[in-house]
């Protein structure tokens, strides 16, 4: 069993994709698990200080531990991607080929499969959600599946897990929060502007990257870094 897992972890598919996994992903998945565990034990949410302490602990984890986690998760994803799509997926992520649809194996109802992303996990995540977190560094909850939007060129929106075909719908509240946080830092210049926040919301929407929600960038700037495993 151990030797098989080791071989899986060093599969060419995994070796090619590993440098493109966002460093943020390890912290995000583990932080969500810690928060759920804390809530079940204490019947209350973590305070901001407690959450920050856990986040700092996870950020300081050894690179070898993060690499082991990413390798195991990529091994799971490989098995859930249809064999005929695996090579094209690697070529698209590594920038060697234009991204096309990458079909996943459906569940028993013909819908998107869900997987656990941690050992002994109490939560399963949709494959397309996992792909967006891993390769685009967008912090999404396991319940955010309805916020994912497939691109117009995606020919198989039900089963496609190509991250380049997946965007995130921006909610009005997201835009307002992005505007509010930004305006607090620019309080002086913000005086005299309308109180309804519509102009700020418009600017927040225009300044964000396509397909990403406002809070995605606000929650963790580490989402823009990749796991190069070189520090």
Swiss-Prot record:
InterPro entries: CTF/NFI, CTF/NFI_DNA-bd-dom, CTF/NFI_DNA-bd_CS, CTF/NFI_DNA-bd_N, MAD_homology1_Dwarfin-type. Residues 188-202 have a biased composition (Basic and acidic residues). Residues 1-192 bind DNA. Pfam families: MH1, NfI_DNAbd_pre-N. It comes from the Eukaryota. GO terms for biological process: DNA replication; positive regulation of DNA-templated transcription; regulation of transcription by RNA polymerase II. One of its GO terms (cellular component) is nucleus. GO terms for molecular function: DNA-binding transcription factor activity, RNA polymerase II-specific; RNA polymerase II cis-regulatory region sequence-specific DNA binding. Residues 188-231 are annotated as: Disordered. Keywords: Activator, DNA replication, DNA-binding, Nucleus, Transcription, Transcription regulation. It is found in: Nucleus. SMART domains: DWA (SM00523). Recognizes and binds the palindromic sequence 5'-TTGGCNNNNNGCCAA-3' present in viral and cellular promoters and in the origin of replication of adenovirus type 2. These proteins are individually capable of activating transcription and replication. Binds DNA as a homodimer. Belongs to the CTF/NF-I family. This is Nuclear factor 1. It comes from Sus scrofa (Pig). The gene is NFI.
């Amino acid at each position: 069993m151990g030797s098989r897992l080791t071989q899986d972890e060093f599969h060419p598919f995994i070796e090619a994709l590993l440098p493109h996994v966002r460093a943020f992903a390890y912290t995000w998945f583990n932080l969500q698990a810690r928060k759920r565990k804390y809530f079940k034990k204490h019947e209350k949410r973590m305070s901001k200080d407690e959450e920050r302490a856990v986040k700092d602990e996870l950020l300081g984890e050894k690179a070898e531990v993060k690499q082991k986690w990413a390798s195991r998760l990529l091994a799971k994803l490989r098995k859930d991607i249809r064999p005929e799509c695996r090579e094209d997926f690697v070529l698209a992520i590594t920038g060697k080929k234009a991204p096309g649809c990458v079909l996943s194996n459906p569940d028993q109802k013909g819908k998107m499969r869900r997987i656990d992303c941690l050992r002994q996990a109490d939560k399963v995540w949709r494959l397309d959600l996992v792909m967006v977190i891993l390769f685009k560094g967008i912090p999404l909850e396991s319940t955010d599946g309805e916020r994912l939007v497939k691109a117009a060129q995606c020919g198989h929106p039900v089963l496609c897990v190509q991250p380049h075909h997946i965007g995130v719908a921006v909610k009005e509240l997201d835009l307002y929060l992005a505007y509010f946080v930004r305006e607090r830092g620019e309080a002086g210049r913000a005086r005299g502007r309308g109180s309804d926040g519509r102009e700020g919301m418009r600017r927040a929407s225009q300044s964000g990257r396509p397909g990403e929600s406002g809070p995605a960038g606000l929650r963790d700037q580490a989402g823009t870094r990749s796991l190069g495993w070189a520090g």
